[in-house]
Amino acid sequence: MDRRLLEILACPICKGKLVYSQDEQELICRFDKLVYPIHDGIPVMLPDSTRPLIER
């Protein structure tokens, strides 16, 4: 994923910073504990597309 894009993307719910997980191809909002999927290199930023973050 393009680093410039990562710098401007924000969580659509809290407007906070997102963390990119290259291994899982996901964007993570640690504040809301939500995970946004990335499909074919395109972040899916719809609130209905999230899943809860399960921290390991």
Swiss-Prot record:
Gene3D superfamilies listed in its UniProt record: 2.20.25.10
SUPFAM superfamilies in UniProt: Trm112p-like
GO cellular component, one term: cytosol
Protein family according to the UniProt entry: Belongs to the UPF0434 family.
Protein name stated in the entry: UPF0434 protein CbuG_1535
Species per Swiss-Prot/TrEMBL record: Coxiella burnetii (strain CbuG_Q212) (Coxiella burnetii (strain Q212))
